[in-house]
């Protein structure tokens, strides 16, 4: 019975971790042609204006100013003027293509991420019995450990996952999420989140854990404080 519970729990946990990721990637690859077609038919004009039109226009202006400045120091003959117009046109077309590709990727990521978040919710609802088995197995596994191992496990999880001892990991994660949703890299925003969110999460998690553990195993709290010092 214990072996069956362990296998069922590990299988459920693996599906919970990898299934949303796999479905998200599959849907994203399937959605990209549809989003590209929708984008190129002109039905997305308002969405485009809402997202990044101002940034795109600024970049168009920058390109034109750059080439004008470059050509001003050269001969201002008719041939050079013609070359300038052709070069600006080529660069503008390239920028429009890059702009469209970026927005198509953003829309595809948004739809795929929505599906990725919806999948675990549906899996929780449809697999309530398996969730109960997983919860029971985790509790049995945790309570079977010695108090020293329990304290070590809690210390490892809190410091590694939600603690404030790994700012570089948090920076990479926040930057990756921001890029995935189409936001530009903002060092000030990332630094603000890294300096506040992990500390708050760590405090709340430890308070919740030891409010519960103080009732069932006071010795565990003593061991934890000794190891933490």
Curated annotation (Swiss-Prot):
Localization terms from the record: Plastid, Chloroplast inner membrane
Topology of this chain in the membrane: Multi-pass membrane protein
The main location class comes to plastid
Q: List the InterPro entries.
A: CemA
Keywords linked to the UniProt accession: Antiport, Chloroplast, Hydrogen ion transport, Ion transport, Membrane, Plastid, Plastid inner membrane, Potassium, Potassium transport, Transmembrane, Transmembrane helix, Transport
Q: Catalysed reaction(s)? A: K(+)(in) + H(+)(out) = K(+)(out) + H(+)(in)
Query: Mind listing the GO biological process terms from this record?
Result: potassium ion transport
Which GO cellular component terms are attached?
chloroplast inner membrane
Molecular function as annotated in GO: antiporter activity; proton transmembrane transporter activity
Q: Which Pfam families match?
A: CemA (PF03040)
Where exactly are the transmembrane stretches of this chain? 7-27, 106-126
Database matches in PANTHER family:
CHLOROPLAST ENVELOPE MEMBRANE PROTEIN, CHLOROPLAST ENVELOPE MEMBRANE PROTEIN-RELATED
* Name under which the protein is recorded: Potassium/proton antiporter CemA
Q: Which organism is it from?
A: Cycas taitungensis (Prince sago)
